[in-house]
Regions:
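N-terminal pre-ligand scaffold of iron-sulfur
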Residues: 10-89, 121-138
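Short cysteine clusters
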Residues: 79, 96-97
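Short cysteine/histidine-rich zinc-coordinating motifs and their immediately flanking basic loops
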Residues: 24, 89-94, 107-112
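Low-complexity, intrinsically disordered Gly/Pro/Thr-rich segments
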Residues: 107-124
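N-terminal export leaders
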Residues: 1-7
Length: 138
């Protein structure tokens, strides 16, 4: 059963890709579904890239990254140090926008402090050309 949710998918930013895409998310069986054939998610076909998904009533977007040929990760883009937003990956590194020097790997694990804990993660699965993310809507 397909349904749509009142959320916006911002799959890229002007800074990194030159355009921004906003659209309703597709939800199947309570999971966010991203089709890698769609232009707004196509950058996730490349290891090291990421997209942000704006979720209605959430302060910071959901961040999804391509970790390897067979793995993806999904997590909150809210830095665990001071609550600033974590930026899209550059050269496989996620940096906190605060300028405090905190960085994370493509799976949301702390690489450099001041953050002491990993980003809040959500189960994500790559099946063929689709990514499924179990996100706790509510």
């Amino acid at each position: 059963m397909l349904s749509s949710f009142s959320a916006l998918a911002c799959a890229c930013t002007d800074e990194h890709y030159g355009e921004s895409h906003l659209a309703e998310l597709v939800i199947e069986q309570g999971r966010i579904v991203l089709d890698l054939g769609e232009s707004r998610y196509r950058m996730l076909n490349t290891i090291g890239n990421g997209v942000k998904i704006e979720i209605t009533r959430q302060e910071k977007p959901l961040l999804i990254t391509r970790v390897s040929e067979t793995r993806v990760a999904a997590f909150s883009s809210q830095c665990t140090h001071a609550g600033y937003e974590v930026l899209l990956p550059e050269q496989g590194i996620l940096a906190c926008a605060s300028g405090h020097g905190g960085t994370f790997d493509l799976e949301g694990r702390v690489l450099s402090e001041p953050p002491k804990s990993n980003l809040q993660s959500y189960p994500a699965q790559l099946i063929t050309n689709r990514i499924y993310v179990a996100y706790p809507f509510g």
